[in-house]
């Protein structure tokens, strides 16, 4: 039977931690264990959560690191079942944080993982040997499709590798899919005649949950070379469903909107390394935007590195691009490259738009700074 080891930080006093850990293990699976007749206990024992270890970690201060093993009894494992099993009832506990889920290999193999990953995206943009440069089509909300075209043109002339829709650019009457995707691609093609380069346009996929697959197919039919999803606004299972659809055969970028309420507390919620790293890679994200450690809304540097490690470590799945975002400017580029290495997408949005010479000049300055930040 497949197994999941769930790792928790329990910030309660260590005095009764053994009892609490056992209640956590049984409460998520075979509750109420103590009240079961002996015959029922024997039937349920194979499916009962079991405490594997209880340790202290000085880096977390007071409290304990508790590891519980859960058998996976369902035939087709899915993220809703897994998260409900390992953290469903515990999410009401104010002093328990889920740090990691350690999956047995046979369980990992049942999830799709990235379709393109780092190597595939590099092939699309034809850039090797340095981090990729990404910017965002900001300020498009409420403005005409002609204005959007001009902004995409400026980004393309500036030499940006990847141009992403703003995550708040939804289906508006001033920038509907049917006009926005062709306008963006036309701007890229126009600039390519002069630059010889074709940046990757990442189209924000929005709409009602049960319409997303059809919306994705429509966008791809219009020529969209990549898509972005605000994953946790919909649910991680939605990302997996998109990735497993053979007709949705373009890279999918995962945005971390809404996850702050789940990750920010040290004592409660789900760790960024798991929520934004391991799970999104398993579900099929080719690249993941997450708060950089450099801005006011950023995660701490150690956790940012753990997110990167979960996305890029060698496993049976393709590696996914980390995209630390927010709080990055021209002065931070060298630091990002030093901290995250070559296999990172550096997302510079506001600084490119605010550049004194405009977006095109900002893009060129971005590439120049990136190339000089060795």
Swiss-Prot record:
<dbReference type="GO" id="GO:0043715">
    <property type="term" value="F:2,3-diketo-5-methylthiopentyl-1-phosphate enolase activity"/>
</dbReference>
<dbReference type="InterPro" id="IPR036422">
    <property type="entry name" value="RuBisCO_lsu_N_sf"/>
</dbReference>
<dbReference type="GO" id="GO:0019509">
    <property type="term" value="P:L-methionine salvage from methylthioadenosine"/>
</dbReference>
<feature type="binding site">
    <location>
        <begin position="349"/>
        <end position="350"/>
    </location>
    <ligand>
        <name>substrate</name>
    </ligand>
</feature>
<feature type="binding site">
    <location>
        <begin position="164"/>
        <end position="167"/>
    </location>
    <ligand>
        <name>substrate</name>
    </ligand>
</feature>
<keyword id="KW-0479">Metal-binding</keyword>
<keyword id="KW-0486">Methionine biosynthesis</keyword>
<keyword id="KW-0413">Isomerase</keyword>
<comment type="function">
    <text>Catalyzes the enolization of 2,3-diketo-5-methylthiopentyl-1-phosphate (DK-MTP-1-P) into 2-hydroxy-3-keto-5-methylthiopentenyl-1-phosphate (HK-MTPenyl-1-P).</text>
</comment>
<protein>
    <recommendedName>
        <fullName>Putative 2,3-diketo-5-methylthiopentyl-1-phosphate enolase</fullName>
        <ecNumber>5.3.2.5</ecNumber>
    </recommendedName>
</protein>
<dbReference type="Pfam" id="PF00016">
    <property type="entry name" value="RuBisCO_large"/>
</dbReference>
<feature type="binding site">
    <location>
        <position position="255"/>
    </location>
    <ligand>
        <name>substrate</name>
    </ligand>
</feature>
<feature type="binding site">
    <location>
        <position position="138"/>
    </location>
    <ligand>
        <name>substrate</name>
    </ligand>
</feature>
<dbReference type="GO" id="GO:0015977">
    <property type="term" value="P:carbon fixation"/>
</dbReference>
<dbReference type="InterPro" id="IPR000685">
    <property type="entry name" value="RuBisCO_lsu_C"/>
</dbReference>
<comment type="similarity">
    <text>Belongs to the RuBisCO large chain family. Type IV subfamily.</text>
</comment>
<dbReference type="InterPro" id="IPR033966">
    <property type="entry name" value="RuBisCO"/>
</dbReference>
<keyword id="KW-0028">Amino-acid biosynthesis</keyword>
<dbReference type="InterPro" id="IPR036376">
    <property type="entry name" value="RuBisCO_lsu_C_sf"/>
</dbReference>
<feature type="binding site">
    <location>
        <position position="327"/>
    </location>
    <ligand>
        <name>substrate</name>
    </ligand>
</feature>
<keyword id="KW-0460">Magnesium</keyword>
<feature type="binding site">
    <location>
        <position position="166"/>
    </location>
    <ligand>
        <name>Mg(2+)</name>
    </ligand>
</feature>
<dbReference type="GO" id="GO:0000287">
    <property type="term" value="F:magnesium ion binding"/>
</dbReference>
<dbReference type="GO" id="GO:0016984">
    <property type="term" value="F:ribulose-bisphosphate carboxylase activity"/>
</dbReference>
<comment type="pathway">
    <text>Amino-acid biosynthesis; L-methionine biosynthesis via salvage pathway; L-methionine from S-methyl-5-thio-alpha-D-ribose 1-phosphate: step 3/6.</text>
</comment>
<comment type="subunit">
    <text>Homodimer.</text>
</comment>
């Amino acid at each position: 039977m497949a197994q999941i080891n769930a790792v928790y930080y329990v910030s309660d006093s260590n005095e009764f931690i053994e009892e609490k850990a056992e209640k956590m293990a049984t409460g998520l699976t075979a509750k109420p264990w103590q009240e079961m007749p002996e015959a029922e206990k024997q039937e349920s024992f194979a499916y009962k959560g079991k405490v594997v270890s209880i340790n202290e970690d000085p880096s977390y201060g007071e409290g304990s690191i508790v590891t519980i093993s859960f058998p996976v009894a369902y035939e087709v494992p899915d993220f809703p079942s897994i998260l409900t099993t390992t953290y469903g009832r515990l999410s009401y506990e104010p002093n328990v944080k889920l740090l990691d889920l350690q999956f047995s290999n046979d369980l990992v193999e049942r999830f799709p993982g990235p379709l393109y990953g780092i190597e595939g995206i590099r092939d699309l943009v034809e850039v090797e040997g340095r981090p990729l440069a990404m910017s965002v089509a900001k300020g498009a909300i409420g403005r005409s499709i002609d204005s959007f075209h001009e902004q995409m043109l400026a980004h393309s002339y500036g030499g940006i590798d990847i141009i992403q829709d703003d995550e708040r650019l939804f289906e508006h009457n001033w920038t509907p899919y049917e006009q926005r995707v062709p306008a963006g691609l036309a701007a890229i093609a126009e600039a390519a005649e002069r630059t010889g380069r074709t940046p990757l346009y990442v189209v924000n996929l929005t709409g009602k949950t049960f319409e997303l697959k059809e919306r994705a197919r429509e966008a791809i039919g219009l020529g969209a070379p990549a898509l972005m999803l605000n994953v946790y606004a919909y649910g991680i299972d939605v990302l997996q469903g998109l990735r497993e659809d053979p007709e949705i055969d373009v890279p999918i970028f995962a945005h971390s909107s809404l996850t702050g309420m789940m990750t920010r507390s040290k004592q409660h919620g789900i760790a960024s390394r798991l929520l934004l790293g391991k799970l999104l890679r398993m579900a099929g994200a080719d690249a993941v935007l997450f708060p950089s450690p450099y801005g006011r809304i950023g995660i701490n540097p150690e956790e940012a590195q753990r997110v990167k490690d979960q996305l890029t470590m060698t496993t049976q799945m393709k590696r996914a691009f980390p995209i630390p975002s927010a709080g990055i400017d021209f002065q931070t580029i060298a630091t990002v490259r030093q901290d995250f290495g070559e296999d990172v997408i550096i997302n510079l949005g506001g600084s490119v738009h605010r550049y004194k010479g405009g977006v095109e000049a900002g893009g060129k300055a971005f590439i120049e700074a990136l190339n000089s930040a060795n």
